[in-house]
């Protein structure tokens, strides 16, 4: 089952500023995934074929038949060939040319594919000179001997000999054995797991190994190894289930290539096709399929035949039906694309976190809906191809084994462009407030010029178009724990959970010491209860961006600084924070690498029961406000959360919180890649 869609392009009309799909490009940009797993999509409606198209197809078939008959009449009988008779009367003596011995492939065919891709042979200048002299000696006419003499003079010139030496150097390099293939691209993760296993070892060697693996030089080495290995493993060798070959030949007066791919039943072909007039053209090669693994099918190739079945003149639905019944060896007759094919590039896999929800069934612009990859905000995507800047090919984290083909997701620039146009349309539909729309636009432009301020974080976030954030795996060191930031609406239990952790395990958890401008009281100690500072010093630190969050209470300033959090981390403890949404940007832009957990409220009735245990009797509208506030926080800041806990029961939530914190010691976590640079 498949669905056909056009590769839509967003255009802005001159009048309404809206979006439109270019109707004229429907036939040209339609794509269908052929030989896809049946659960990936639904069937498309057939394309209506006009009588004129049938007439053109018939005319082309008649012309091809006439050309074949003409070539047959022009063929000469080899037995009556005057040239062959003359050669048989005066046969030429064959000459052994040692310079060409290494150029012959296994099949001995000079026109075969293997001879074209074989590495250059190493030649000796003396052998070349000897072969030329033998050729000159065997020639009878003086003109040919003079021609060979000119070649001999050329070979003996210093410039030619330098070029000849360069040729041999390149040939020597290309004939070298390939470097060893990497076994894994997760050496850094393995080293971190080993470090955790041996850090409490009772053996001297185990402690020494733990110390060695925790050094910055070793971690940098493992990171460099994984970066190189990840690139090397991108171009993996052909798997045994995909055998392929390619030959060039003439077909109907055109130069075509014949591609044979042996495809297993569990490996989809992984290609999309589109109609271009009466032609069927390969539109996209999808990662993970037999077409991509063979490396012989390319975008822009026109399909003429598949296993002897003529394809030209058929629509994409018919092509789907033809391929649905074919297994084993698939033989394609193709007209190669006229586009110049650049050599394959070892693409680096880019890991991103999705900051928006995406459902391809609701996207009219996805070029091939059955290949669209559905994902939710917070999912990790592995981008394996960005050849098409508008539509990337990706896998969801954890689905690589269950997802045979890569899926299509919107490219970052494309997603930003169409979201910006949606916002423009919505703004244009809003009623004018003062008679001129320019007023609102000027206000918006002024916000962008405003310096980032935690107190105005909501305005700052409204200007962003959330798409993707590049991520990398990070395993926290044993002596430098990530701070835990709890966030949620009031009365959702985040403060109670924090206090329980602090009182239950004081040797493991600690809170940052806040700053204040009020006077110190008798029982208080500077640096233990508060950092007591002057109002001027507090304002200077606030202007310098040193506070995660700050506020004023009874004409005194209070604030939590990044330095206070860092002091807790330096002691080896886990710093616990309860912060507001306005503080998340400052916290994440620091070097603290926080782990942010959202504490969400349960249903309204369950929330009422939880608050009743604390002798609280909120009104129904207050409960609705808490739930609505949580929904707004998740909608506006959910892309910044690392985990979420629905607090249906405080004891269960406490155990879940402990599980998430303990997991940071044993498993690497996805963090923004900018944190590791």
Curated annotation (Swiss-Prot):
Residue stretches making up the L27 domain: 121-178, 180-236
Tissues where the protein occurs: Expressed in the retina and in the neural tube.
Signal peptide: none
Location of region: Required for the correct localization of PALS1 and PATJ at cell-cell contacts and the normal formation of tight junctions and adherens junctions: 1-347
A single MF term (Gene Ontology): ATP binding
Keywords, comma-separated and alphabetical: ATP-binding, Cell junction, Cell membrane, Membrane, Nucleotide-binding, Repeat, SH3 domain, Tight junction
Domain-related comment: The PDZ domain is required for apical location.
Annotated spans, Disordered: 39-81, 506-526
Family membership: Belongs to the MAGUK family.
Organism name: Danio rerio
Pfam families: Guanylate_kin (PF00625), L27 (PF02828), L27_N (PF09060), PDZ (PF00595), SH3_2 (PF07653)
Protein name per the record: Protein PALS1
Gene Ontology annotations for the cellular component aspect, listed alphabetically: adherens junction; apical junction complex; apical plasma membrane; bicellular tight junction; nucleus; photoreceptor inner segment; plasma membrane
Chain ranges of the SH3 domain: 347-419
Bilayer topology annotation: Peripheral membrane protein
Subcellular location per the Swiss-Prot or TrEMBL entry: Apical cell membrane; Cell junction, Tight junction
The Guanylate kinase-like domain, residue ranges: 481-662
Top-rank taxon: Eukaryota
């Amino acid at each position: 089952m498949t669905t056909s869609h056009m590769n839509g392009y967003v255009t802005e009309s001159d009048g309404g500023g809206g979006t439109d799909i270019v109707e004229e490009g429907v036939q040209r940009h339609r794509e269908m995934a052929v030989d896809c797993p049946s659960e990936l999509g639904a069937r498309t409606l057939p394309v209506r074929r006009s009588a004129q198209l049938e007439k053109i197809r018939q005319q082309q078939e008649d012309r091809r038949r006439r050309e074949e008959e003409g070539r047959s009449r022009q063929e000469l009988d080899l037995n009556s060939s005057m040239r062959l008779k003359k050669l048989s009367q005066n046969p030429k003596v064959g000459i052994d040319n040692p310079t060409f011995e290494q150029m012959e492939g296994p099949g001995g065919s000079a026109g075969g594919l293997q001879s074209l891709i074989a590495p250059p042979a190493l030649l000796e200048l003396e052998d070349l000179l000897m072969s030329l002299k033998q050729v000159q000696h065997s020639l009878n006419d003086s003109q040919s001997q003079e021609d060979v003499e000119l070649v001999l003079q050329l070979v003996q010139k210093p410039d030619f000999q330098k070029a000849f030496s360069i040729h041999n150097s390149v040939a020597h390099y290309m004939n070298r054995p390939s470097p060893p293939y990497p076994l894994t691209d997760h050496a850094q993760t393995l080293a971190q797991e080993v470090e955790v296993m041996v850090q409490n070892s009772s053996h001297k060697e185990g402690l020494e190994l733990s110390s060695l693996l925790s050094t910055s030089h070793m971690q940098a080495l493992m990171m460099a190894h994984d970066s190189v290995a990840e690139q090397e493993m991108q171009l993996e060798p052909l798997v045994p289930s995909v055998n392929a070959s390619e030959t060039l030949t003439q077909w109907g007066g055109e130069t075509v290539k014949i591609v044979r791919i042996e495809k297993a039943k569990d490996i989809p072909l992984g290609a999309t096709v589109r109609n271009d007039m009466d032609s069927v053209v390969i539109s996209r090669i999808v990662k993970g399929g037999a077409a991509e693994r063979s490396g012989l099918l390319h975008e822009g190739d026109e399909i003429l035949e598949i296993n002897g079945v003529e394809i030209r003149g058929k629509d994409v639905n018919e092509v789907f039906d033809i391929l649905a019944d074919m297994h084993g060896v698939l033989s394609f007759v193709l007209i190669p694309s006229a586009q110049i094919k650049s050599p394959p590039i070892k693409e680096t896999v880019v890991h991103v976190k999705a900051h928006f929800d995406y459902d391809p069934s609701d996207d009219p612009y996805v070029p091939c809906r059955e290949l669209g990859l559905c994902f939710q905000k917070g999912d990790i995507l592995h981008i394996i191809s960005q050849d098409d800047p508008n539509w990337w090919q990706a896998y969801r984290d954890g689905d690589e084994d269950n997802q045979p083909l890569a899926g299509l997701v919107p490219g970052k620039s494309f997603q930003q462009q169409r979201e910006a146009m949606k916002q423009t349309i919505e703004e244009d539909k809003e009623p004018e407030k003062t008679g001129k729309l320019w007023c609102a636009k000027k206000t918006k432009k002024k916000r962008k010029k405003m310096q980032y301020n935690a107190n105005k974080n909501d305005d700052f976030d409204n200007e962003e178009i959330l798409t993707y954030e590049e991520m990398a795996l990070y395993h926290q060191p044993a002596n430098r724990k990530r701070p835990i930031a709890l966030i949620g609406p009031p009365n959702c239990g985040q403060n109670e959970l924090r206090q329980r952790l602090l009182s239950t395990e004081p040797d493991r958890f600690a809170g940052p010491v806040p700053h204040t401008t009020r006077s110190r009281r008798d029982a208080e100690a500077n640096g233990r209860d508060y950092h007591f500072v002057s109002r001027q010093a507090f304002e200077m630190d606030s202007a310098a961006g040193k506070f995660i969050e700050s506020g004023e209470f009874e004409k005194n300033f209070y604030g939590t600084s990044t330095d206070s959090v860092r002091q807790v981390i330096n002691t080896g403890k886990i710093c616990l924070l309860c912060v507001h949404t306005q503080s998340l940007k400052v916290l994440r832009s620091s070097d603290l690498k926080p782990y942010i957990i959202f504490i969400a409220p349960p249903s309204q009735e369950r929330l009422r029961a939880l608050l009743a245990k604390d002798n609280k009797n909120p009104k129904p509208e207050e409960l609705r406000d808490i739930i609505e506030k949580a929904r707004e926080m998740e909608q506006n800041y959910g892309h910044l959360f690392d985990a979420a806990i629905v607090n249906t029961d405080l004891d269960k939530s406490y155990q879940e919180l402990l599980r998430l914190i303990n997991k940071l010691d044993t498993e690497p976590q996805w963090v923004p890649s900018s944190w590791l640079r």
